[in-house]
Amino acid sequence: MLKQIDYQGKLEEIAEKFQGRKTEVSKEVNKTVQQIVADIQKNGDTALFNYAKKFDGYDVNTSNLLVTRMEREAGLEQIDEDYFRILRRTKSQIEEFHKHQLGNSWNIFKENGVIMGQIARPLERVALYVPGGTAAYPSTVIMNAVPALLAGVKEIIMITPVKADGKVNPNILAAAEVCGIETIYKVGGAQGVAAVAYGTESIPKVDKIVGPGNIFVATAKKICYGVVDIDMIAGPSEVLVIADKTAKPKYIAADLMAQAEHDKLASAILVTTSEKLVQQVDEELNRQVQNLERREIIESSIRNYGGAIVVKNIDDAFDVSNQLAPEHLEVLTSEPLTQLPKIKNAGSIFIGEYTPEPLGDYMSGSNHVLPTGGTAKFYSGLGVYNFIKYLTYSYYPKEVLADFKEDVETFAKSEGLTAHANSISVRFDEM
Protein backbone atom coordinates (compact mmCIF):
# COMPACT_ATOMS: atom_id res chain seq x y z
CA MET A 1 0.00 0.00 0.00
CA LEU A 2 2.82 2.40 0.93
CA LYS A 3 4.92 3.17 -2.12
CA GLN A 4 8.49 4.38 -1.73
CA ILE A 5 9.24 7.75 -3.31
CA ASP A 6 12.65 8.54 -4.76
CA TYR A 7 13.19 12.11 -3.71
CA GLN A 8 16.74 12.61 -5.02
CA GLY A 9 16.51 15.78 -7.06
CA LYS A 10 12.73 15.52 -7.11
CA LEU A 11 11.80 17.35 -3.93
CA GLU A 12 10.14 20.20 -5.80
CA GLU A 13 8.13 17.70 -7.84
CA ILE A 14 7.04 15.90 -4.67
CA ALA A 15 6.13 19.19 -3.03
CA GLU A 16 4.09 20.21 -6.06
CA LYS A 17 2.05 17.01 -5.88
CA PHE A 18 1.73 17.18 -2.09
CA GLN A 19 0.63 20.81 -2.17
CA GLY A 20 -1.45 20.55 -5.32
CA ARG A 21 -4.23 18.41 -3.88
CA LYS A 22 -6.50 21.39 -3.39
CA THR A 23 -9.94 20.74 -4.73
CA GLU A 24 -10.14 22.85 -7.86
CA VAL A 25 -13.19 25.07 -7.98
CA SER A 26 -14.91 24.55 -11.31
CA LYS A 27 -16.27 27.52 -13.23
CA GLU A 28 -19.75 26.13 -12.63
CA VAL A 29 -19.30 25.99 -8.84
CA ASN A 30 -17.80 29.47 -8.75
CA LYS A 31 -20.59 30.88 -10.92
CA THR A 32 -23.28 29.19 -8.83
CA VAL A 33 -21.85 30.50 -5.56
CA GLN A 34 -21.44 34.01 -6.95
CA GLN A 35 -25.11 33.98 -7.93
CA ILE A 36 -26.14 32.76 -4.48
CA VAL A 37 -24.06 35.41 -2.73
CA ALA A 38 -25.44 38.18 -4.96
CA ASP A 39 -28.99 36.96 -4.40
CA ILE A 40 -28.59 36.92 -0.62
CA GLN A 41 -27.00 40.37 -0.71
CA LYS A 42 -29.94 41.75 -2.71
CA ASN A 43 -32.92 39.82 -1.38
CA GLY A 44 -31.93 38.83 2.17
CA ASP A 45 -34.24 36.45 4.00
CA THR A 46 -36.37 35.68 0.95
CA ALA A 47 -33.40 34.31 -0.97
CA LEU A 48 -31.96 32.61 2.12
CA PHE A 49 -35.17 30.72 2.85
CA ASN A 50 -35.55 29.69 -0.80
CA TYR A 51 -32.06 28.20 -0.90
CA ALA A 52 -32.55 26.39 2.41
CA LYS A 53 -35.64 24.74 0.97
CA LYS A 54 -33.93 23.97 -2.33
CA PHE A 55 -30.66 22.54 -1.02
CA ASP A 56 -31.53 21.20 2.44
CA GLY A 57 -35.23 20.43 2.13
CA TYR A 58 -35.98 22.52 5.21
CA ASP A 59 -38.96 24.86 4.94
CA VAL A 60 -37.40 27.64 6.99
CA ASN A 61 -39.00 30.96 7.88
CA THR A 62 -38.56 33.67 10.50
CA SER A 63 -40.40 31.61 13.11
CA ASN A 64 -38.24 28.47 12.87
CA LEU A 65 -34.89 29.91 11.76
CA LEU A 66 -33.42 29.97 15.27
CA VAL A 67 -32.90 26.91 17.43
CA THR A 68 -35.25 27.39 20.37
CA ARG A 69 -34.43 26.58 23.97
CA MET A 70 -36.96 23.76 23.82
CA GLU A 71 -35.23 22.28 20.77
CA ARG A 72 -31.89 22.55 22.52
CA GLU A 73 -33.17 20.78 25.60
CA ALA A 74 -34.69 18.00 23.49
CA GLY A 75 -31.36 17.46 21.75
CA LEU A 76 -29.31 17.66 24.95
CA GLU A 77 -31.47 15.01 26.58
CA GLN A 78 -29.96 12.54 24.11
CA ILE A 79 -26.43 13.22 25.39
CA ASP A 80 -25.17 11.24 28.37
CA GLU A 81 -23.23 12.88 31.19
CA ASP A 82 -19.97 11.16 30.28
CA TYR A 83 -19.99 12.80 26.85
CA PHE A 84 -20.60 16.17 28.49
CA ARG A 85 -17.63 15.46 30.75
CA ILE A 86 -15.45 14.79 27.71
CA LEU A 87 -16.59 18.02 26.06
CA ARG A 88 -15.88 20.03 29.21
CA ARG A 89 -12.45 18.44 29.56
CA THR A 90 -11.69 19.23 25.93
CA LYS A 91 -12.74 22.85 26.43
CA SER A 92 -10.53 23.10 29.53
CA GLN A 93 -7.53 21.75 27.62
CA ILE A 94 -8.04 24.18 24.75
CA GLU A 95 -8.44 27.09 27.18
CA GLU A 96 -5.26 26.23 29.07
CA PHE A 97 -3.23 26.30 25.86
CA HIS A 98 -4.85 29.28 24.16
CA LYS A 99 -4.91 31.67 27.11
CA HIS A 100 -1.18 32.19 26.55
CA GLN A 101 -1.96 33.70 23.14
CA LEU A 102 -3.85 36.67 24.53
CA GLY A 103 -2.80 39.90 22.83
CA ASN A 104 -1.31 42.73 24.79
CA SER A 105 -1.91 46.46 24.81
CA TRP A 106 1.19 48.53 25.50
CA ASN A 107 2.41 52.12 25.44
CA ILE A 108 5.63 54.11 25.36
CA PHE A 109 6.07 57.40 27.21
CA LYS A 110 9.11 59.29 25.90
CA GLU A 111 10.91 62.05 27.73
CA ASN A 112 10.03 64.58 25.02
CA GLY A 113 6.30 64.10 25.68
CA VAL A 114 5.58 61.71 22.83
CA ILE A 115 3.17 58.88 23.65
CA MET A 116 2.85 55.85 21.38
CA GLY A 117 1.16 52.52 21.84
CA GLN A 118 -0.97 49.63 20.76
CA ILE A 119 -4.47 48.71 21.90
CA ALA A 120 -5.75 45.14 21.58
CA ARG A 121 -9.47 44.99 20.84
CA PRO A 122 -11.58 41.86 20.25
CA LEU A 123 -13.83 41.51 17.23
CA GLU A 124 -17.46 42.38 18.00
CA ARG A 125 -19.33 39.51 16.35
CA VAL A 126 -18.15 36.19 14.86
CA ALA A 127 -20.01 33.44 13.00
CA LEU A 128 -19.03 29.81 13.46
CA TYR A 129 -19.95 27.58 10.53
CA VAL A 130 -20.62 23.99 11.57
CA PRO A 131 -21.34 21.29 8.96
CA GLY A 132 -24.50 19.33 9.65
CA GLY A 133 -25.60 15.76 9.08
CA THR A 134 -23.89 12.59 10.22
CA ALA A 135 -20.38 14.02 9.64
CA ALA A 136 -20.80 16.65 12.33
CA TYR A 137 -17.71 17.45 14.36
CA PRO A 138 -18.39 18.89 17.83
CA SER A 139 -14.63 19.15 18.39
CA THR A 140 -14.56 21.84 15.71
CA VAL A 141 -17.14 23.85 17.64
CA ILE A 142 -14.84 23.95 20.65
CA MET A 143 -11.67 24.58 18.63
CA ASN A 144 -13.25 27.62 16.97
CA ALA A 145 -15.25 28.96 19.88
CA VAL A 146 -12.68 28.86 22.69
CA PRO A 147 -10.11 31.21 21.08
CA ALA A 148 -12.91 33.66 20.27
CA LEU A 149 -14.21 33.51 23.84
CA LEU A 150 -10.73 34.07 25.28
CA ALA A 151 -10.19 37.00 22.92
CA GLY A 152 -13.30 38.62 24.35
CA VAL A 153 -15.56 38.44 21.29
CA LYS A 154 -18.89 39.80 22.49
CA GLU A 155 -21.17 37.71 20.31
CA ILE A 156 -20.61 34.30 18.74
CA ILE A 157 -23.37 32.99 16.51
CA MET A 158 -23.50 29.56 14.90
CA ILE A 159 -24.91 28.59 11.54
CA THR A 160 -25.47 24.95 10.66
CA PRO A 161 -27.54 23.29 7.93
CA VAL A 162 -30.37 20.94 8.87
CA LYS A 163 -32.40 18.39 6.97
CA ALA A 164 -36.14 18.47 6.37
CA ASP A 165 -36.92 17.69 10.03
CA GLY A 166 -35.16 20.88 11.14
CA LYS A 167 -33.15 19.12 13.85
CA VAL A 168 -29.56 19.99 14.72
CA ASN A 169 -27.15 17.16 15.52
CA PRO A 170 -27.34 16.64 19.33
CA ASN A 171 -23.54 16.42 19.66
CA ILE A 172 -23.25 19.85 18.04
CA LEU A 173 -25.85 21.23 20.44
CA ALA A 174 -23.90 19.77 23.36
CA ALA A 175 -20.65 21.39 22.24
CA ALA A 176 -22.43 24.72 21.76
CA GLU A 177 -23.91 24.41 25.24
CA VAL A 178 -20.50 23.77 26.81
CA CYS A 179 -19.09 26.82 25.00
CA GLY A 180 -22.02 29.04 25.94
CA ILE A 181 -23.15 29.68 22.36
CA GLU A 182 -26.78 30.75 22.60
CA THR A 183 -27.63 31.80 19.04
CA ILE A 184 -27.83 29.01 16.46
CA TYR A 185 -29.37 29.56 13.02
CA LYS A 186 -30.59 26.58 11.02
CA VAL A 187 -28.99 27.56 7.73
CA GLY A 188 -25.80 26.51 6.00
CA GLY A 189 -24.14 26.21 2.63
CA ALA A 190 -23.02 29.15 0.53
CA GLN A 191 -26.29 30.88 1.39
CA GLY A 192 -25.55 30.72 5.11
CA VAL A 193 -22.07 32.15 4.60
CA ALA A 194 -23.47 35.00 2.50
CA ALA A 195 -26.17 35.68 5.10
CA VAL A 196 -23.69 36.27 7.92
CA ALA A 197 -21.28 38.12 5.61
CA TYR A 198 -23.83 40.69 4.43
CA GLY A 199 -26.59 40.35 7.01
CA THR A 200 -30.29 39.80 6.31
CA GLU A 201 -33.49 40.91 7.99
CA SER A 202 -33.15 38.06 10.49
CA ILE A 203 -29.41 37.37 10.65
CA PRO A 204 -26.87 40.01 11.72
CA LYS A 205 -23.73 40.80 9.74
CA VAL A 206 -20.57 39.51 11.42
CA ASP A 207 -16.93 40.59 11.39
CA LYS A 208 -15.44 37.14 10.80
CA ILE A 209 -16.52 33.68 9.65
CA VAL A 210 -14.69 30.59 10.90
CA GLY A 211 -15.28 26.88 10.51
CA PRO A 212 -14.99 24.18 7.84
CA GLY A 213 -17.36 23.30 5.03
CA ASN A 214 -17.66 21.74 1.58
CA ILE A 215 -16.47 23.28 -1.68
CA PHE A 216 -19.53 25.55 -1.87
CA VAL A 217 -18.94 26.85 1.66
CA ALA A 218 -15.22 27.38 1.02
CA THR A 219 -15.93 29.19 -2.25
CA ALA A 220 -18.50 31.43 -0.56
CA LYS A 221 -16.00 32.30 2.16
CA LYS A 222 -13.43 33.18 -0.47
CA ILE A 223 -15.90 35.37 -2.39
CA CYS A 224 -17.06 37.16 0.77
CA TYR A 225 -13.54 37.77 2.05
CA GLY A 226 -12.98 41.50 2.23
CA VAL A 227 -16.59 42.16 3.14
CA VAL A 228 -15.90 39.99 6.15
CA ASP A 229 -12.78 38.31 7.50
CA ILE A 230 -12.38 34.52 7.35
CA ASP A 231 -10.14 32.00 9.07
CA MET A 232 -8.60 30.30 6.02
CA ILE A 233 -9.43 28.29 2.92
CA ALA A 234 -8.45 24.82 4.06
CA GLY A 235 -7.69 22.01 1.65
CA PRO A 236 -7.47 18.24 2.14
CA SER A 237 -5.86 17.13 5.39
CA GLU A 238 -2.30 15.86 5.67
CA VAL A 239 0.27 14.34 8.01
CA LEU A 240 4.00 13.86 7.66
CA VAL A 241 5.80 11.50 10.04
CA ILE A 242 9.55 11.79 10.57
CA ALA A 243 10.87 8.53 12.02
CA ASP A 244 14.18 6.80 12.64
CA LYS A 245 14.87 3.12 13.24
CA THR A 246 13.72 3.38 16.88
CA ALA A 247 10.12 4.19 15.90
CA LYS A 248 7.41 1.54 16.24
CA PRO A 249 5.93 0.53 12.86
CA LYS A 250 2.46 -0.14 14.25
CA TYR A 251 2.27 3.38 15.71
CA ILE A 252 3.33 4.97 12.43
CA ALA A 253 0.85 2.90 10.42
CA ALA A 254 -1.98 3.79 12.79
CA ASP A 255 -1.15 7.50 12.59
CA LEU A 256 -0.91 7.51 8.80
CA MET A 257 -4.32 5.87 8.52
CA ALA A 258 -5.85 8.21 11.08
CA GLN A 259 -5.17 11.05 8.69
CA ALA A 260 -5.91 9.13 5.51
CA GLU A 261 -9.46 8.27 6.63
CA HIS A 262 -10.53 11.92 6.38
CA ASP A 263 -10.69 12.11 2.62
CA LYS A 264 -9.52 10.39 -0.56
CA LEU A 265 -7.45 13.53 -1.17
CA ALA A 266 -5.79 13.34 2.25
CA SER A 267 -2.05 12.82 2.29
CA ALA A 268 -0.03 10.63 4.68
CA ILE A 269 3.73 10.59 4.20
CA LEU A 270 6.53 8.85 6.08
CA VAL A 271 10.04 10.30 5.94
CA THR A 272 12.62 7.99 7.46
CA THR A 273 16.27 6.99 7.54
CA SER A 274 15.37 3.28 7.53
CA GLU A 275 14.27 1.26 4.48
CA LYS A 276 13.47 -1.63 6.80
CA LEU A 277 11.02 0.59 8.68
CA VAL A 278 9.18 1.37 5.43
CA GLN A 279 8.61 -2.35 4.83
CA GLN A 280 7.45 -2.88 8.41
CA VAL A 281 5.05 0.07 8.25
CA ASP A 282 3.60 -1.20 4.98
CA GLU A 283 2.97 -4.59 6.57
CA GLU A 284 1.24 -2.89 9.50
CA LEU A 285 -0.90 -0.79 7.18
CA ASN A 286 -2.13 -3.88 5.36
CA ARG A 287 -2.85 -5.63 8.66
CA GLN A 288 -4.55 -2.79 10.54
CA VAL A 289 -6.67 -1.49 7.66
CA GLN A 290 -8.62 -4.77 7.57
CA ASN A 291 -10.61 -3.79 10.65
CA LEU A 292 -11.30 -0.14 9.84
CA GLU A 293 -14.68 1.14 8.66
CA ARG A 294 -13.25 3.69 6.23
CA ARG A 295 -10.91 1.20 4.59
CA GLU A 296 -11.72 2.24 1.01
CA ILE A 297 -10.96 5.91 1.70
CA ILE A 298 -7.76 5.05 3.58
CA GLU A 299 -6.41 2.81 0.83
CA SER A 300 -7.26 5.34 -1.87
CA SER A 301 -5.63 8.30 -0.15
CA ILE A 302 -2.45 6.42 0.77
CA ARG A 303 -2.20 4.88 -2.70
CA ASN A 304 -2.61 8.20 -4.52
CA TYR A 305 -1.26 10.81 -2.13
CA GLY A 306 0.74 8.89 0.44
CA GLY A 307 4.18 7.37 0.36
CA ALA A 308 7.51 6.89 2.07
CA ILE A 309 10.69 8.87 1.48
CA VAL A 310 13.98 7.32 2.60
CA VAL A 311 16.69 9.87 3.40
CA LYS A 312 20.37 9.56 4.29
CA ASN A 313 20.16 11.23 7.67
CA ILE A 314 17.70 12.87 10.03
CA ASP A 315 18.70 16.39 8.95
CA ASP A 316 17.60 15.54 5.41
CA ALA A 317 14.27 14.38 6.84
CA PHE A 318 13.66 17.79 8.36
CA ASP A 319 14.71 19.48 5.11
CA VAL A 320 12.03 17.48 3.29
CA SER A 321 9.45 18.33 5.93
CA ASN A 322 10.26 22.04 5.87
CA GLN A 323 9.88 22.06 2.10
CA LEU A 324 6.49 20.32 2.24
CA ALA A 325 5.27 22.38 5.23
CA PRO A 326 2.71 19.80 6.39
CA GLU A 327 -0.48 20.55 8.28
CA HIS A 328 0.47 17.96 10.92
CA LEU A 329 4.03 16.85 11.66
CA GLU A 330 4.88 13.91 13.91
CA VAL A 331 8.45 13.42 15.14
CA LEU A 332 9.09 9.81 16.15
CA THR A 333 12.82 9.65 16.79
CA SER A 334 15.08 8.64 19.65
CA GLU A 335 15.44 12.22 20.92
CA PRO A 336 12.50 14.13 19.44
CA LEU A 337 12.51 17.15 21.77
CA THR A 338 16.09 18.03 20.86
CA GLN A 339 15.09 18.29 17.19
CA LEU A 340 12.39 20.91 17.63
CA PRO A 341 14.75 23.75 16.52
CA LYS A 342 15.11 22.07 13.11
CA ILE A 343 11.44 22.59 12.30
CA LYS A 344 10.63 25.75 10.34
CA ASN A 345 7.34 24.98 8.63
CA ALA A 346 4.43 22.98 10.07
CA GLY A 347 0.87 23.67 11.12
CA SER A 348 1.18 21.74 14.38
CA ILE A 349 3.93 19.46 15.72
CA PHE A 350 3.42 16.23 17.66
CA ILE A 351 6.55 15.11 19.48
CA GLY A 352 7.24 11.57 20.65
CA GLU A 353 5.46 8.25 20.30
CA TYR A 354 2.79 9.07 22.87
CA THR A 355 1.64 12.29 21.21
CA PRO A 356 -0.27 10.99 18.18
CA GLU A 357 -1.88 13.55 15.91
CA PRO A 358 -5.46 12.51 16.85
CA LEU A 359 -4.72 13.69 20.39
CA GLY A 360 -4.31 17.14 18.86
CA ASP A 361 -7.59 16.78 16.99
CA TYR A 362 -9.37 16.59 20.31
CA MET A 363 -7.64 17.18 23.61
CA SER A 364 -3.92 18.04 23.55
CA GLY A 365 -4.73 21.75 23.81
CA SER A 366 -3.37 23.02 20.51
CA ASN A 367 -5.85 23.96 17.80
CA HIS A 368 -6.81 21.61 15.00
CA VAL A 369 -7.76 24.37 12.56
CA LEU A 370 -4.49 24.42 10.62
CA PRO A 371 -3.01 25.56 7.29
CA THR A 372 -2.81 22.92 4.55
CA GLY A 373 -1.26 22.48 1.12
CA GLY A 374 2.10 23.98 2.04
CA THR A 375 0.58 27.20 3.36
CA ALA A 376 2.15 26.50 6.75
CA LYS A 377 5.14 28.30 5.24
CA PHE A 378 3.30 31.57 5.78
CA TYR A 379 0.12 30.83 7.76
CA SER A 380 -0.44 29.82 11.38
CA GLY A 381 -3.15 27.69 12.91
CA LEU A 382 -6.24 29.30 14.40
CA GLY A 383 -5.66 31.08 17.69
CA VAL A 384 -6.80 33.86 19.98
CA TYR A 385 -4.87 36.35 17.84
CA ASN A 386 -7.25 35.66 14.94
CA PHE A 387 -10.07 37.26 16.91
CA ILE A 388 -8.17 40.36 18.02
CA LYS A 389 -7.33 43.48 16.08
CA TYR A 390 -4.60 45.90 17.09
CA LEU A 391 -5.08 49.65 17.07
CA THR A 392 -1.95 51.78 17.09
CA TYR A 393 -1.91 55.34 18.41
CA SER A 394 0.50 58.22 18.79
CA TYR A 395 0.52 61.64 20.46
CA TYR A 396 3.09 64.31 19.52
CA PRO A 397 3.47 67.73 21.19
CA LYS A 398 3.96 70.72 18.88
CA GLU A 399 7.63 71.17 19.74
CA VAL A 400 8.40 67.56 18.77
CA LEU A 401 6.44 67.87 15.52
CA ALA A 402 8.58 70.93 14.77
CA ASP A 403 11.67 68.76 15.00
CA PHE A 404 10.25 66.40 12.34
CA LYS A 405 8.69 69.17 10.19
CA GLU A 406 11.30 69.60 7.48
CA ASP A 407 12.03 65.89 7.11
CA VAL A 408 8.36 64.95 6.75
CA GLU A 409 7.72 67.79 4.29
CA THR A 410 10.70 66.76 2.16
CA PHE A 411 9.64 63.11 2.24
CA ALA A 412 6.06 63.98 1.23
CA LYS A 413 7.16 66.25 -1.63
CA SER A 414 9.51 63.54 -2.93
CA GLU A 415 6.43 61.34 -3.36
CA GLY A 416 4.46 64.13 -5.02
CA LEU A 417 2.08 64.44 -2.07
CA THR A 418 2.16 68.18 -1.46
CA ALA A 419 -1.06 68.12 0.58
CA HIS A 420 0.71 65.85 3.02
CA ALA A 421 3.51 68.40 3.33
CA ASN A 422 0.97 71.18 3.73
CA SER A 423 -0.71 69.28 6.59
CA ILE A 424 2.55 69.66 8.48
CA SER A 425 3.55 73.19 7.47
CA VAL A 426 0.10 74.74 8.07
CA ARG A 427 0.50 74.06 11.78
CA PHE A 428 3.47 76.42 11.89
CA ASP A 429 2.17 79.26 9.69
CA GLU A 430 1.47 81.45 12.69
CA MET A 431 5.01 81.11 13.97
Swiss-Prot record:
Gene responsible for this protein: hisD
Organism (species): Lactococcus lactis subsp. lactis (strain IL1403)
Entry protein name: Histidinol dehydrogenase
Cofactor(s) annotated in UniProt: Zn(2+)
GO molecular function: histidinol dehydrogenase activity; NAD binding; zinc ion binding
HAMAP family xrefs: HisD (MF_01024)
GO biological process, one term: L-histidine biosynthetic process
Active-site positions on this chain: 327 (proton acceptor), 328 (proton acceptor)
Binding residues annotated for NAD(+), in chain numbering: 129, 191, 214
